[in-house]
Amino acid sequence: MPRKHSEQLFRQAQKHIPGGVNSPVRAFKSVGGTPVFFHSARGAHLFDEDDNKYIDYVGSWGPMILGHNHPHVVAAVQAAVEQGLSFGAPTATEVAMADKVCELVPSMDMVRMVNSGTEATMSAIRLARGYTGRNKIIKFEGCYHGHVDSLLVKAGSGAIAIPGSPGVPEAVTADTLVLDYNDAASVTQAFKEHGDDIAAVIVEPVAGNMNCVPATENFLQTLRQQCDDNGAVLIFDEVMSGFRVALGGAQGHYGITPDMTTLGKIVGGGMPVGAFGGKQAIMEHLAPLGPVYQAGTLSGNPVAMAAGLATLNLISEPGFHQALAEKTTRLLEGLTAAAHAEGVAFTTAQAGAMFGLFFTDQNRISSFTEVMACDSERFNRFFHAMLDQGIYLAPSAFEAGFVSAAHSNDDIDATITAARKAFGKI
């Protein structure tokens, strides 16, 4: 499949854009090769600068649950644009959006709109610290919460955090405790040692940046119990899982109620939107009601709110998420059968319409350590074998995949057929 225009554009992009991309994973550094430059998308399909067509399982990294360019979402955006791009003032659309979010996510009494998932998690942590008067936070290895300094860390010696990126001073991460994902015992021990100082626990109930690793029920129940017993705030980062794992997010699926939730991706319908919210008692500490400051020039942007509201209304239709999950199951069962037919050690994970592909002989992956033990080089070869057949997967062994409502049975059948050939080559 020729991609000469992508190669030319990538060379040109590197002149003025660091690495030639505006977000690192897009550079194909994990899988090798040249990133694909796209010019348009419709439904479940992407079209690159050489007019090659791809079945898309990235979905702009999650937001495109309806598929690309859904006519109702496009119409809502066009109508909003005609009224003005931005006012920097309250609008009726942002009120309707807040009402809809709180309706769909019952744990959220109040919500504040922001411009990205990173901004949402950053603000939620600040608010939790302001509400509790404490400084320490717990996060889990392999969980990504945006490029916030205090959260961009990995586990060092024991639970002592060390910077995960140059430019992040150790002093900034000194109050961040990093524990193993799905390890309930480590959570209990951390609260035993630091309980009076822990402001919040932040967790992805479905970890989507170490591929796709759902939390165990016991793990989430332990988080809820320890936060209750010690007066800490439980934050579910549902930037990725929100409105995708289930209409009410992963928390609705698991039946575990957090104190705060962060949202992104689907909530903006493809526009740059994030949100954070939770219990009224906590949210009332946020300015202008309370002393914890947070602001944003483009927060609640009317065009973005129109896209998000149109998307949420469409995915609220009865049976939407069940049909999407069944479609995802059909895809994964087909991929697994294709791999095993070719003698390839392979397993999958699913959470609603999120999925993970693992090259391993283990039946289930539940921790960052297990993810790292998978054969990422074999994934890289699989990725390119699929790409050459017009199947666009996430260009990293550590990213989740997404199925949209626009994927047809023919799309899924074509993907499984391509996978059978790809498994045979790797």
Swiss-Prot record:
Compartments reported by the entry: Cytoplasm
CDD domains in UniProt: OAT_like (cd00610)
GO MF term set: glutamate-1-semialdehyde 2,1-aminomutase activity; pyridoxal phosphate binding; transaminase activity
EC number: 5.4.3.8
Tagged with keyword Cytoplasm: yes
A Pfam family assignment: Aminotran_3
Cysteine disulfide links: none
Keywords, ordered alphabetically: Cytoplasm, Isomerase, Porphyrin biosynthesis, Pyridoxal phosphate
Xref: PROSITE patterns: AA_TRANSFER_CLASS_3
UniProt keyword Aminoacyl-tRNA synthetase present: no
Modified residues (N6-(pyridoxal phosphate)lysine): 265
Similarity field: Belongs to the class-III pyridoxal-phosphate-dependent aminotransferase family. HemL subfamily.
Matches recorded under PANTHER family: GLUTAMATE-1-SEMIALDEHYDE 2,1-AMINOMUTASE, GLUTAMATE-1-SEMIALDEHYDE 2,1-AMINOMUTASE 1, CHLOROPLASTIC-RELATED
Protein known as: Glutamate-1-semialdehyde 2,1-aminomutase
Organism, scientific name: Alcanivorax borkumensis (strain ATCC 700651 / DSM 11573 / NCIMB 13689 / SK2)
Gene that this sequence comes from: hemL
